[in-house]
C-alpha cells in the first residue's frame, strides 16, 4: 500500500513486528564478548562451536541461555562461535507498564562488543595459587584459604568472586561464599548478608543460582544462611551494627568449617561492599573487623592503588593471630593487587533499583525470563511455557498479632530515631530485662507452618542457643513498632527471624532469617491495631517469630501484587 503523495511502501504489521534474525559472533582465543541487556528486554545466546564461559561457569554447546537486566561478558580460552538473538520482552514494574524498546546492538543489547584485552589470565593465576594453598592446607591439617575481595564500587568484585567460585567447583571443591554487601542479595533479597556452601555449578542465567523452592530446578538449589541487616550501607551508624552481624556470620562460617572437612579444605571467598574500598569514614575499621573475624589469609584488591597501598601497610606478611591453626603454622596474610577489567561499567541508581526489585520479585514469583534449561525438564504446573514461576500465598493478619521491630539507625538524609530510653542499659535500677521484653510485644499464639520458607536451614542454631552473642553492648538499634499499624508498612518487607517474639533485642539482632514476607496493604481501621495483607512464599499461618522491618532497606517495592 502506498501513502498518499509520498509513493512510499508501508510494510505489513507482521513484517514490522518480526524480530531480527540471530547473528553469529566469532571470538578469537583469549577474548570476550561484553554485552549489556536492559531490564524488560531479553537476549538469547547459544554456543555453536568451541568453548566459552561466563564468570567462570562453562557454557554448554547448543544450549540457549536467556539474559535480561544483565551486564556481563562471555570469555573464551581457545576461540568460539556464538549465536546471539533477541528474545521476547518480559514485564517489569507495575502491571500495564510500557515495554522497553530493544537496544541497537546484536540481540537487542544496549551495548555489545568484543574485547581482546582482559584480566582473565591474571584471575586464573589467582585460582591456581588458591589451589596450591588448598593442597598445602590439607597436607598441614589447617584451614584452606580465606579470601577477602576489596575494591571501590563497580570494580568487578562480585564477578571475581563468581569466577573463583566457578573454578573451585569445577575442581570438585566446595567453597563457602560470603556476601557482605547489603546493596545486593546473594540467594536472598537485598539487605541480607549471606553465607552459602557451593557444591555445584553456578547458574549462568540467574547469577548465583536460586534458594530452595517447591518444584524442580535445572541447577541444584543452594541453602543459604541469611542474616538481615536492613540498611543500605555498612557504615550507617558508625558501622557497629554491621560489625555485630558480621561477627555472627563469621561464627557460623567458622563452625561450618570445623564440622565440614570439604568446606574447610576449600576455604572461604568473601565479597564486600564497595564503600569500604573508598576510604570513607570508618571503612578501615570495618575491614580490620572482617579480616580479624574471618581469619583472612589472602586479600585481593581490585581497581584502587590507594587501597592496595593501605592494605599492604596494614596486613601484608602479618601473622593471622586469631586463627589457632594459623598461629601453630605461622601462616601470614598475603595482599595481592589485581587489574580491574575494562568491561566494568558504572551502574546508576535507576539500574540498581531495578536490580533490587527484580531480586524481590524473583524471591516470591520466580523468574519471568524464559529459560530453555527449564523447558528441558519435565516440570509441574508451576511452570508457564518455559518460564519458571512460583506460587506465593496471600493472607490477612491483625497487626497486634505480630512482633515487628524497626531499625533506628539513621541513613543518609534521615534524622536519627535512636532513643536510649528504649534499651536496657538505660533503664532504672531493678528494672528487669524480661519485664522490658514483655512490655514490647503483644502476640497471639500462632503456630509456624510445617514447611520451611526459602533461606531457612533446619540445622541452624536458634537465636537463644548455640553460638554466643556477637555483641559487646546492649545498645542494639531496634525498637518495637507500636500499635496502630503505620501506613508506611505498605509495600515493604518483613524479615522473619528464628528468634521468639519476646526475645531480647540482642537475640533478635543475632538470629538468622527464616524467610521474608511482603506487606501489600495496610488497613488501619480494621482488626486489632490494623489489618495487614501479606504475601508469603508458602501457605499456612505466619510464624510466631520476631520480625525486622525492611523500611530503610530494601525499602518500598510498589506494585508487587495488584
Curated annotation (Swiss-Prot):
Region named Disordered: 1-27, 415-483
Keyword RNA-binding in record: no
InterPro entries: Clp1, Clp1/Grc3, Clp1_C, Clp1_C_sf, Clp1_N, Clp1_N_sf, CLP1_P, P-loop_NTPase
Domain of life of the native organism: Eukaryota
One Gene Ontology term of the molecular function aspect: ATP binding
Pfam families listed in its UniProt record: Clp1 (PF06807), CLP1_N (PF16573), CLP1_P (PF16575)
Binding residues annotated for ATP, in chain numbering: 32, 71, 154-159
Keyword annotations of the record: ATP-binding, mRNA processing, Nucleotide-binding, Nucleus
Chief localization: nucleus
GO cellular component: mRNA cleavage factor complex
Keyword field contains Nucleotide-binding: yes
Gene Ontology biological-process annotations: mRNA 3'-end processing; tRNA splicing, via endonucleolytic cleavage and ligation
Biased composition (Low complexity): 445-479
Location in or out of the cell: Nucleus
Stated family: Belongs to the Clp1 family. Clp1 subfamily.
Function: Required for endonucleolytic cleavage during polyadenylation-dependent pre-mRNA 3'-end formation.
Record's subunit section: Component of a pre-mRNA cleavage factor complex. Interacts directly with PCF11.
Family annotation (HAMAP family): Clp1
Designated name of the protein: mRNA cleavage and polyadenylation factor CLP1
Gene: CLP1
Amino acid at each position: 500500500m502506498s501513502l498518499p503523495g509520498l509513493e512510499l511502501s508501508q510494510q505489513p504489521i507482521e513484517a514490522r513486528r518480526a524480530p531480527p534474525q540471530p547473528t553469529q559472533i566469532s571470538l578469537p582465543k583469549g577474548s570476550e564478548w561484553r554485552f549489556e541487556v536492559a531490564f524488560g528486554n531479553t537476549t538469547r545466546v547459544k554456543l555453536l562451536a568451541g568453548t566459552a564461559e561466563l564468570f567462570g561457569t562453562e557454557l554448554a554447546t547448543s544450549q540457549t541461555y536467556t539474559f535480561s537486566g544483565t551486564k556481563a561478558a562471555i570469555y573464551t580460552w581457545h576461540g568460539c562461535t556464538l549465536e546471539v538473538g533477541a528474545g521476547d520482552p518480559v514485564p517489569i514494574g507495575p502491571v500495564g507498564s510500557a515495554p522497553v524498546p530493544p537496544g541497537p546492538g546484536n540481540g537487542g543489547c544496549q551495548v555489545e562488543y568484543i574485547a581482546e584485552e582482559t584480566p582473565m589470565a591474571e584471575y586464573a593465576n589467582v585460582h591456581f595459587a588458591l589451589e596450591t594453598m588448598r593442597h598445602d592446607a590439607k597436607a598441614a591439617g589447617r584451614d584452606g584459604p580465606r579470601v577477602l575481595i576489596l575494591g571501590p564500587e563497580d570494580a568487578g568484585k562480585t564477578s571475581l568472586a563468581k569466577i573463583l567460585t566457578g573454578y573451585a567447583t569445577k575442581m570438585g571443591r566446595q567453597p563457602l561464599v560470603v556476601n557482605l554487601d547489603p546493596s545486593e542479595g546473594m540467594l536472598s533479597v537485598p539487605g541480607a548478608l549471606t553465607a552459602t556452601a557451593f557444591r555445584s555449578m553456578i547458574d549462568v542465567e540467574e547469577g548465583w543460582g536460586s534458594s530452595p523452592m517447591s518444584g524442580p530446578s535445572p541447577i541444584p538449589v543452594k541453602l543459604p544462611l541469611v542474616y538481615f541487616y536492613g540498611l543500605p550501607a555498612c557504615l550507617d551508624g558508625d558501622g557497629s551494627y554491621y560489625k555485630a552481624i558480621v561477627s555472627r556470620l563469621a561464627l557460623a562460617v567458622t563452625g561450618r568449617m570445623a564440622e565440614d572437612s570439604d568446606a574447610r579444605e576449600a576455604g572461604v571467598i568473601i565479597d564486600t561492599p564497595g564503600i569500604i574500598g573508598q576510604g570513607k569514614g570508618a571503612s578501615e575499621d570495618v575491614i580490620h573487623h572482617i579480616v580479624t573475624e574471618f581469619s583472612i589469609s589472602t586479600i585481593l584488591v581490585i581497581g584502587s592503588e590507594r587501597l592496595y597501598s593501605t592494605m599492604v601497610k596494614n596486613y601484608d606478611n602479618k601473622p593471622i593471630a586469631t586463627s589457632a591453626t594459623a598461629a601453630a603454622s605461622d601462616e601470614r596474610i598475603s595482599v595481592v593487587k589485581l587489574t580491574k577489567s575494562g568491561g566494568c561499567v558504572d551502574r546508576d541508581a535507576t539500574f540498581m533499583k531495578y536490580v533490587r526489585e527484580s531480586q524481590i520479585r524473583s524471591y516470591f514469583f520466580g523468574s519471568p525470563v524464559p529459560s530453555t534449561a527449564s523447558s528441558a525438564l519435565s516440570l509441574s504446573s508451576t511452570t508457564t511455557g518455559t518460564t519458571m514461576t512460583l506460587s506465593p500465598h496471600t493472607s490477612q493478619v491483625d497487626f497486634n498479632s505480630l512482633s515487628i521491630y524497626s531499625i533506628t539507625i539513621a541513613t543518609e538524609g534521615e534524622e536519627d530515631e535512636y532513643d536510649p530510653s528504649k534499651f536496657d542499659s538505660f533503664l532504672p535500677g531493678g528494672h528487669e530485662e524480661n519485664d522490658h521484653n514483655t512490655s514490647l510485644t503483644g502476640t497471639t499464639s500462632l503456630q509456624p507452618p510445617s514447611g520451611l520458607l526459602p533461606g531457612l536451614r533446619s540445622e541452624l542454631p536458634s537465636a537463644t542457643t548455640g553460638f554466643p552473642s556477637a555483641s559487646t553492648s546492649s545498645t542494639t538499634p531496634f525498637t518495637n513498632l507500636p500499635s496502630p499499624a503505620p501506613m508506611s508498612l505498605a509495600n515493604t518487607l518483613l524479615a522473619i527471624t528464628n528468634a521468639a517474639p519476646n526475645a531480647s533485642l540482642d537475640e533478635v539482632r543475632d538470629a538468622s532469617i527464616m524467610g521474608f514476607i511482603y506487606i501489600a496493604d495496610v488497613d488501619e481501621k480494621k482488626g486489632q491495631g490494623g489489618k495487614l495483607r501479606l504475601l508469603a512464599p508458602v501457605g499456612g499461618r505466619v510464624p510466631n517469630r520476631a520480625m525486622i522491618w525492611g523500611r530503610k532497606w530494601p525499602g518500598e517495592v510498589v506494585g508487587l501484587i495488584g
